Amino acid sequence: MFTIYKSNSLNTLLLKAYHIIEEKPFSNIFEKEIFIYDNKVLFQYLNIFIAEKKGISANFKFYHPNDFIWKLFKIILSKKELKNIFTHSMIIWEIIKILDNKKFFENCSKKKDMIKKFKFSFLMASIFKKYILYRPEWINQWEIEKNISIFDKNEQWQIKLWMEIIHNTKKINQSSDHFANLFYNIQKIIKEKKIKKKYLPKRFFIISSFSMNPSYIKIFQNISIYTDIYFLYITPFKKNIFNFIQDNKIFTDIKIEKKNILNDSLITLWGQYEEIYYFYILKSKKNKVINCFKKNKNKSLLSQIKNNFFNDSEFTRKKRFLEISDHSISINICFNKKNEIEVLYEKLLIFLNENSSIKPGDIVVTSFSLDTYISSINLIFQSIDNKKTIPFFIAKKSSKTTEIMLWSFKKILNLSNSRFENEEILELLDVPEIAEKFNFSEEEIKILYHWIEETNIRWGINEKHKNYLLFPKNKQNTWFYGIEKLLLSYAMNDTEKIWNGVLSCSFINGSRSELIGKLISFIKILEKWQKKLSKLQYLTYWRSLYSDLVSDFFQNNTKIEKSIQIIQKKWIEIIDDSLSSNYLKKISINILKKIFFYKYYDNNHEIFLPGVVNFCYPDSVCYIPFKVICMIGTDHTSIPKTNYLDNFNLLKKYPLIGDINLYQKYSYLFVQSLSCAEKYFYISYIGYSVKDESKVHPSILVDQLLNYITLNFCFIGDQNLSYKENSKKITKYLCKKHKKQFFYETKNIESFIQDDIKNDFKHTEKNISHKNLLKKNTDNEINLKDLINFWKHPIRYFYNSHLKIKIRQKKQKINTTETFLVNPLNSFKIKNKLLDYIIHNKNITKLYQHYLLSGKLPYHFFGEIFWIKNIKEMKLIANKVMQYRIEKEEKKINLNIEKYQIYGVLSEIQSTGLLRWKTSSIRYSDRIALWLEHLIYSILGGCGKSKIIGYKSQIWSFSSLNSHRAHSYLLEYIKGYIKGMKEPLFLTKSGASWLDQVYDERNNCIKNDYYTKIKAYKKLLYTWKGDNYTEGEQEDYYLKKTITISNKKNIKKICESAEKWLIPILKNKG
């Protein structure tokens, strides 16, 4: 008997199943109740459901539809040892074997085409698997060369390819049993009534799922005369919607005013997916259909939509009223992924705080692109203080430890293709078990980062490896050349010398010799595996690869033991599966790597954790009712686009009802989520482009939901509004735009900011309070260096020196590529040294050799070009400096300015004033530094012009000042310094840029005309925001923490600070 229980509630259907089990118990107490579904999460839910009813859940057996069908094949065909040898892997290798034969595809015979062969074989294996399940009659007819002419000539190569696979399988005496011919055999046995009923299960329950295809349904229908089959069919539609949907049309041209159900694309999409059940199950008069629908009593928008699906009333188009207080459906437009999770967190807090009936376990968050959100989820949900923590669980396919082991395995397997970039190699030491294997401590790993930067190790093991990668054969920037430098440095005892064309480093001493040895050992093992993995080998050779790899790289312990076993088991399964195809040629590890990771992640290992907010993929919800369902990442990229490789897929050319369709599946999952949400359905997506903040459209499914609501609902009094006007009002109400700085404007989670600052800054003292810090600022002695450093960047100095807060030293970022260009920091250092050598008439040839061997200059003519260009530029500056540099006087100072004592050193005092020089352009910080020194020089009686010479002979100078005036100015800057310790002073580069535009030197005033103001503000904003080539001042971490928003209030403060402190500098320009 085939009985269909049809309902819009999973709990109703499970209750029916429970009553059947209770009312008709098996005579054999050991016989298990069988449930068939394609996701273990539902089985987990079923066990909890039954346990709540009965007090215990036992004697249940869960089957995936594929597994159960093969179990039936074994029973009905009396083949206990029956195996499905036509696996995806087996078909791949069979096709590769065929492609190796020149007779089949002439253009795929070369060895260098191995990866192309694999990709083609992988694609065709996937397509053939679909043919076997969805067109078994094709496969059976092809094998007996029947009805081939119905296919176009340019499609018949697929038939020949399949025939070749079957021929090769029989050739090596392997079974040619696959689903298609077993399906045919079972149909024959059922027709002949030769089934032995006693071996079949007495009854089983099937839950409607994506894995149900027409062939499976036909088998179940045919055996229902021998056993009781209960089909639990979950659908929001009480009546059959298919009478209202045109065949083979998902979307129709919507005529807004036409009252037709076809306008409801959401309903159409769901209906298209459910056609399989209507045509293969519900239409059959042999089957018994029992409706068990429940109407939603709630009057919310969400409940009314579900009732529309349930009732006949949705066809009349009588609009229902939408309450302004109704928040059961919300659509949130966010700035980026982090912001999207921040907004979600705040919303979940509201759900939990305002609804005592909602617990964390009543909430599920789904996304089609969950992997891309994991880091943001962990960051936001783990950063909040304990009082506001929401327990959560991310349903990943592997444990965290297994994910790390898989990452390491993938990295090592990729060594054959690797350039051995420094960061890529050092990342392996971030895995504790690998670091432990080679005996590296955390401190030693930090030292390695420093060594690699100093020795300019970039990529490549040695010159041979570079040659293998088809690059010029030289040892510059390679690992072993860098190690030579380290060994020479150790031998030279902390001195910097050139020996045999190698420059030693001055930072190595004898105490670090052991660390050099560890590094050599680590690189040698990596080199061994690079060579091993670069060679083609037989499949049998690769079988033991994982155990060998673990032995060489990992310190075995109980923490990773289980993960090692999981991965090793899967690796051996993949190899054994491949060996069953009897492929006898050598193969690249790259192909096995692709197969392994595809197969590993293709399996569904997801679980739910009770009592917490679960993050998962939409298909894991499995009709399970939740009070709150949130869908994140629903932008226009969340639905898969057309796969152009499907041009090979004949199912697309000759479609039938029940064919798998990814687009329909994603659409169905979206509407299923809406249907399973009991109280709230929350949607969010990123609505702004990362590039230029332009508008990004949501998924078409979100648009269709809005369209459906617009067609069926309106606010009170809006009954006569046009579709367009009604759409505007509803969209404005349901869609909320969230700003980038969401958290700074949210009172409920202020603690996040504090945690954020703690994460971003390193406190050098514990339990620091602002009051205590300010009390310490009573010392009247001021070092000139401190005064200058403060005025160069007041906000940074405020954090560093008085709050004792500094940016946390993140893991050192090292350059990964060889230096064709000199990085800005090295360029600055080289130019300064070069200018110093030219001014002091030192040997610049030796300096060039030093920088070339150190690796800081690019190799060969790249370095020569840089050096020659900068010699010319530095000579121009040096000539200008030498023009003014007559004396080299240096003076210690100790000045009393009222109650303050200033001490320090003034250097390069000339008879004409102070002289300073630099290799780059003169900035506002250089001006203010020279200005403060010039004030002290003037107080001491100096009467010359102080000047600074910069790039391209640029000169900034200050005119002579009398002592009294200089004293007054300096006192003001000292007072500003003291005040700047108590609260941040908004003196910035942006403010200086603004002032340069508005200050009138001739009249010593601020220009207030409209044109000048606009130009000045544009310059300020440009300096603050930057562009694609120049980093804006807003990226400065200290400013970012102080000036969180560039609003009118903050811009005014920036301009006022610039006006007060920088006008004296412009006014006294010489």
Curated annotation (Swiss-Prot):
Any one GO cellular component localisation term in the record: exodeoxyribonuclease V complex
Keyword tags: ATP-binding, DNA damage, DNA repair, DNA-binding, Exonuclease, Helicase, Hydrolase, Nuclease, Nucleotide-binding
Listed GO MF terms: ATP binding; DNA binding; DNA helicase activity; exodeoxyribonuclease V activity
CDD domains, per database record: RecC_C-like
Domain of life: Bacteria
Keyword Nucleotide-binding: yes
Record GO biological process: double-strand break repair via homologous recombination
InterPro entries reported in the protein's UniProt record: DExx_box_DNA_helicase_dom_sf, P-loop_NTPase, RecC, RecC_C, Restrct_endonuc-II-like
Nucleotide-binding among keywords: yes
Pfam families: Exonuc_V_gamma, RecC_C
Subunit structure as annotated in this protein's UniProt entry: Heterotrimer of RecB, RecC and RecD. All subunits contribute to DNA-binding.
Stated role: A helicase/nuclease that prepares dsDNA breaks (DSB) for recombinational DNA repair. Binds to DSBs and unwinds DNA via a highly rapid and processive ATP-dependent bidirectional helicase activity. Unwinds dsDNA until it encounters a Chi (crossover hotspot instigator) sequence from the 3' direction. Cuts ssDNA a few nucleotides 3' to the Chi site. The properties and activities of the enzyme are changed at Chi. The Chi-altered holoenzyme produces a long 3'-ssDNA overhang and facilitates RecA-binding to the ssDNA for homologous DNA recombination and repair.
NCBIfam families the record matches: recC
Family as reported in the entry's similarity comment: Belongs to the RecC family.
Miscellaneous comment in the UniProt entry for this protein: In the RecBCD complex, RecB has a slow 3'-5' helicase, an exonuclease activity and loads RecA onto ssDNA, RecD has a fast 5'-3' helicase activity, while RecC stimulates the ATPase and processivity of the RecB helicase and contributes to recognition of the Chi site.
Record protein name field: RecBCD enzyme subunit RecC
Organism: Buchnera aphidicola subsp. Acyrthosiphon pisum (strain APS)
